């Protein structure tokens, strides 16, 4: 009897788990529980309730639009509309506080404009909905909100069909006919997730292994598609491929094999869960023989659903180097764990990013309103990888390491002049409060509700001084400099990469120089701000200066590197 082949190659091993591997698997699951990665049954039931409510709202939304477009009651009721999930929730690897990636699928007579003009107000009217922020001009437009305290990211797709019944499934490629590209991308979130689950030998093994790998990647700060690291779908496909190669293994073995196999992988050979398939659309499918840009992908991980795309096109030379270094480190730890020389907790130690380098670039996006900052900070963050690739071309820089998330602040300034200085990168003793994107969403709502009446120059009616807020998001890039024995770095000129980055950001068609700015500074590790460290974490200490004149000159040149806010 032949064993079923999972994936495009035969398995490496079909051996069942040993007693020790089973014991290590139990220990792994216990460690994941200790790390609070599993949600309580009550919270999971609450998510189901929220999705049921969203389905009802979607049905009402489609009916409302249908009636407005002169359909009769029967046709409007039959038009349907359906909610799908994708990402970690659909994969079954969500945890406490995770958002739900959600897709609303509608028939052809319901437009994207209706999504924002009709569905968004319907959501705002619900008392269960808070922190709602719409981003209609994103490439994949989205509405973010909380429903009964659960974060929802809601995207939109319109099919070229007159009705979307509740029993509709998205697996049929023909459903993509006549659908615009942005909707294909949205639909493929669900389609890819479903295919990943269909292409693994054992879903329970896959899910536990994926929870472990995702948590490891987050702890090591290498989980963020936007800045050049794999995102959730890419990590899921990598884990799925290892499951295919070891179809009878338990999760502990999958995790241990994961690091060694992927570090030794013959990149840029792609990771595929199944052969790339053709389909009914005249659309681009990943093909490095046909497209030079596809050939340039360093660690291609290809989505299984038609049309196949590369989920890791953002990876740069630097981020690839960092990923592979982390896999070597993790592989060595996993080897020790598998012989019971170390506990699983050793694998999940926090990153040392803010201790690893001597010099960092701080990239700060600033705006004078919360609404502007939500969009502007997202735009600047999306361009960071382009700054990384330009820094990689500087002779003196061996590696440019972007941190995987930004840090948000609100500076409360006492005058317009002070606010302008803060937004331009001038360091002032200004009161600030920590914030996050949820607070920005709240502030955006508050701004919309605020009176448009002109404030008095000396402040509000109750005598309080007027506050001029400046919202900032700061991202970090660690610089690893070239180490050439006997040839110390005499000058580090990053004016060209930074100027190109400024120009790239400010080409955005929504850029407003009266509201927004971006600036870059060089910061030594000893001068990093408190918010990048956890409470009680030891900060980097200044090292004793070496006596060589060249080394001193090199440090001074970097210190003096002036990066304008052009």
From Swiss-Prot:
Coiled coil (UniProt feature): none
Domain of life (superkingdom): Eukaryota
Residues annotated for Mg(2+) 1 binding in this entry: 99, 101
Residues noted as binding Mg(2+) 2 in the record, renumbered to the chain: 99, 101, 153
InterPro entries per record: NT_sf (IPR043519), NuclTrfase_I-like_C (IPR011068), PolA_pol_cen_dom (IPR007012), PolA_pol_NTPase (IPR048840), PolA_pol_RNA-bd_dom (IPR007010), PolyA_polymerase (IPR014492)
An example molecular function term from Gene Ontology annotations: poly(A) RNA polymerase activity
Region (Disordered): 437-463, 530-566
Alphabetized UniProt keyword annotations: ATP-binding, Magnesium, Manganese, Metal-binding, mRNA processing, Nucleotide-binding, Nucleus, RNA-binding, Transferase
GO biological process: co-transcriptional mRNA 3'-end processing, cleavage and polyadenylation pathway; nuclear mRNA surveillance of meiosis-specific transcripts
Cofactor dependency: Mg(2+); Mn(2+)
UniProt cross-references to CDD domains, sorted A to Z: NT_PAP_TUTase
Pfam short name (any one): PAP_central
UniProt-listed SUPFAM superfamilies: Nucleotidyltransferase, PAP/Archaeal CCA-adding enzyme, C-terminal domain, PAP/OAS1 substrate-binding domain
Compartment list: Nucleus
Swiss-Prot/TrEMBL catalytic activity: RNA(n) + ATP = RNA(n)-3'-adenine ribonucleotide + diphosphate
Family to which the UniProt record says this protein belongs: Belongs to the poly(A) polymerase family.
Role according to the record: Polymerase that creates the 3'-poly(A) tail of mRNA's. May acquire specificity through interaction with a cleavage and polyadenylation factor (CF I).
Name under which the protein is recorded: Poly(A) polymerase pla1
Originating species: Schizosaccharomyces pombe (strain 972 / ATCC 24843)
Gene: pla1
